[in-house]
């Protein structure tokens, strides 16, 4: 997502020409080279899903989700946080559902996790962002009269309303268990 974000930031200067003065060209290069040095996102996604999550039956992931659920408890009963806690709750549930389905079907369809690893990685990334946005909004709301804190709530709201909908698409793809895909090859 870093590479994508850098490329989208570059578009702000569309038509400007060479953007060296703003430093964004270096960010675009750095974000791309990091993917080359660190390995492809797909390899990282497969490693996350198969070696780290599937290998222990999702136990460590459940520990992580328990941390995310603490934020739900911290924001419970606060009407100003409902948008954020609802979004986080939805992402936690989607993550649990996806892992449960993948674990239940791993013997019948061992390649399923390979086909959806990238979508799972991105979905989990959005679940973590939903947690960060909920936490950020909760921390900023008591001081929202200050413009800096108000901007934090607005940024979190932007994330939930504008960026988080992609998570639904990612989780749909994970859950589809597209049985047609193996037949194509």
Regions inferred by a protein language model and the residue ranges of each:
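Short acidic/histidine-centered micro-motifs embedded in hydrophobic/aromatic stretches
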Residues: 67
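Alpha-helix capping/hinge segments and adjacent helical runs
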Residues: 1-63, 147, 158-184
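C-terminal amphipathic alpha-helical interaction region
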Residues: 52-55, 70-185
């Amino acid at each position: 997502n870093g590479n994508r974000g850098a490329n989208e930031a570059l578009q702000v200067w569309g038509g400007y020409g060479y953007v060296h003065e703003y430093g964004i060209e270096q960010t675009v290069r750095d974000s791309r080279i990091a993917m080359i040095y660190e390995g492809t996102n797909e390899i990282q996604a497969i490693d996350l899903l198969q070696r780290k999550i599937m290998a222990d039956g999702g136990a460590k992931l459940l520990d992580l989700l328990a941390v995310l659920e603490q934020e739900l408890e911290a924001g419970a009963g606060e009407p100003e946080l409902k948008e954020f806690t609802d979004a986080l709750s939805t992402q936690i549930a989607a993550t649990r559902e996806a892992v449960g389905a993948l674990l239940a079907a791993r013997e019948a369809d061992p390649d399923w996790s390979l086909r959806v690893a990238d979508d799972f990685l991105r979905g989990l990334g959005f679940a973590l962002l939903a947690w960060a946005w909920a936490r950020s909004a909760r921390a900023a709301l008591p001081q929202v009269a200050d413009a800096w804190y108000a901007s934090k709530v607005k940024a979190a709201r932007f994330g939930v309303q504008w960026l988080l909908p992609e998570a639904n698409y990612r989780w749909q793809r994970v859950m589809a268990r597209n049985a047609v895909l193996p037949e194509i090859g």
